[in-house]
């Protein structure tokens, strides 16, 4: 299936692309800049609105739901395979899909370790692999890391089934905390699917948008 064909399966009209050198602005770069702005008080101009991050995640989940609906699994969702472009930071998903995964994991094991689901490392392949990865990406979007070591430690703890959520997240945003915990649980049969996640995130986006308008 060609990437363009997936556009018609996705109500939010987000295309799915295979990663290429033409896609220069990776989400991983964006997050590094955002974290610098948060902790170093630099002059880097990146959006800091909570609703913005939820909106971008809704875009991502919408794209994943589209590929899952045609029995395609990404198997390697991570910030280096998510691209942002334009003044509105339009989001695109790249990377290796489906049966290509076995070759990719062999050649790039360190790149996917923190984002790959525990069962995925054991060669259990299911759409729920992507849901774990989405949980990690969501956490990174909404919780800036001060250092690379802090990031690695936190995501490794998730991999080791230690779900210690920051108080600022669990107390300030309990619904988001609940969603992240559901996505990164180790029993993949209990993880929600992309359709459920999209509905939950769209509802959250509506709530945050409504609250912002009242302020």
From Swiss-Prot:
It is an enzyme of class 2 (transferase). One of its GO terms (cellular component) is host cell cytoplasm. It catalyses: L-seryl-[protein] + ATP = O-phospho-L-seryl-[protein] + ADP + H(+); L-threonyl-[protein] + ATP = O-phospho-L-threonyl-[protein] + ADP + H(+). The keyword Kinase applies. Residues 1-205 form the Protein kinase domain. Its main location: host cell. InterPro entries: CC_SR_Kinase, Kinase-like_dom_sf, Prot_kinase_dom. Keywords: ATP-binding, Host cytoplasm, Host-virus interaction, Kinase, Nucleotide-binding, Serine/threonine-protein kinase, Transferase. One of its GO terms (molecular function) is protein serine/threonine kinase activity. It is found in: Host cytoplasm. Plays a role in the inhibition of host eIF2alpha/EIF2S1 phosphorylation, thereby increasing viral fitness. In the insect host, targets the endogenous insect heme-regulated inhibitor (HRI)-like eIF2alpha kinase. Belongs to the protein kinase superfamily. Ser/Thr protein kinase family. Interacts with the kinase domain of host EIF2AK2. This is Probable serine/threonine-protein kinase 2.
């Amino acid at each position: 299936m060609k990437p363009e064909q997936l556009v018609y399966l996705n109500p939010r009209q987000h295309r799915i692309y295979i990663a290429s050198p033409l896609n220069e602005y990776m989400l991983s770069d964006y997050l590094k800049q955002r974290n610098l702005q948060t902790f170093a008080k630099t002059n880097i101009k990146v959006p800091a609105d909570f609703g913005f991050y939820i909106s971008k995640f809704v875009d991502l989940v919408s794209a994943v739901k589209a590929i899952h609906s045609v029995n395609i699994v990404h198997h390697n969702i991570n910030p280096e395979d998510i691209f942002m472009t334009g003044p509105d930071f339009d989001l695109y998903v790249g990377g290796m899909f489906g049966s290509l995964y076995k070759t990719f994991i062999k050649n790039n094991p360190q790149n996917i370790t923190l984002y790959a689901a525990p069962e995925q490392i054991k060669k259990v392949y299911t759409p729920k692999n992507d849901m774990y990865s989405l949980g990690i990406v969501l956490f990174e979007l909404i919780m800036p890391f001060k250092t690379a070591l802090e990031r690695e430690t936190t995501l490794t703890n998730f991999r080791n089934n230690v779900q210690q959520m920051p108080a600022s997240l669990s107390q300030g945003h309990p619904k988001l905390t609940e969603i992240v915990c559901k996505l990164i649980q180790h029993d993949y049969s209990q993880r929600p699917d992309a359709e459920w996640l999209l509905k939950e995130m769209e509802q959250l986006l509506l709530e945050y948008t409504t609250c912002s308008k009242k302020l």
